[in-house]
Amino acid sequence: MEKKALKEIKCDLVVVGGGPAGMAAAVAAYEEGLRDILILERDDKLGGILRQCIHNGFGLHRFGEELTGPEYAARYEKMVMEYGIPFMTDTMVTGISPERVVTAQNTKEGIFKIKAGAVILAMGCRERPKGALNIAGHRPAGIYTAGTAQKFVNMKGYMPGREVVILGSGDIGLIMARRMTLEGAKVKAVLELMPYSGGLARNIEQCLNDFGIPLMLSHTVVEIHGKDRLEGVTIGKVDANRQPIPETFEYIPCDTLLLSCGLIPENELTKEYIQRSREWADGLHQPFLS
């Protein structure tokens, strides 16, 4: 059977990612006079991670008022709509060539190509999973990244568990400590490998101190217990080389472990196709990674 030619279109600017950064980039380009813009988003709606961030604290610098995550995203989505900037949701970008040919696919169009004058990458990050942390033990149910738990609670209406330990004190971990507490769970501790927290001081105060949740610095999870469902974790203090100190080990019974251990950039598209540079390429609107 003869192969069907891939559909190819042209566009002055393709924005990969329809989260707040992608929408802001598209809006800024439009306000600078560019009109031929296309946003590609793999999720079914624009907004990215902010759709599940129902806490406030967004928008103070950009809009001069305090907004929740969905409200902040909605502001940009409204501008995208008002400006008539086209976007495609449920669309996965699978490649970008050095000639700025973007390959994407969705259920409606199948596989198609876009010859772009310029490409903006706004794919965001993903959370570091348990497999990247080298924690001893089995793989029982009850272990989630903090963002996954946030989506379950805020968007799906599911509670991941009732007795919780959180590893990592980044802002999402601190916010989920408060969120789980408000939903009736008992957060027994937030552990942080470093001797300082990775979160904002206001989040430590509002999410931990206000609820009496202990923050244990220079501590980590050294072993996971349980086979079918998480039964508990062994924690311990770490030395200056971040190695666990055996005489400090302590067992904490819990049915849920949330991981807030950093983010991994969604940069796979850049590795093969895009030249890394700290300069603005050569004035020809070449895609770049700074």
Functional labels for PLM-detected ranges:
Residues 1-290:
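Residues forming the flavin
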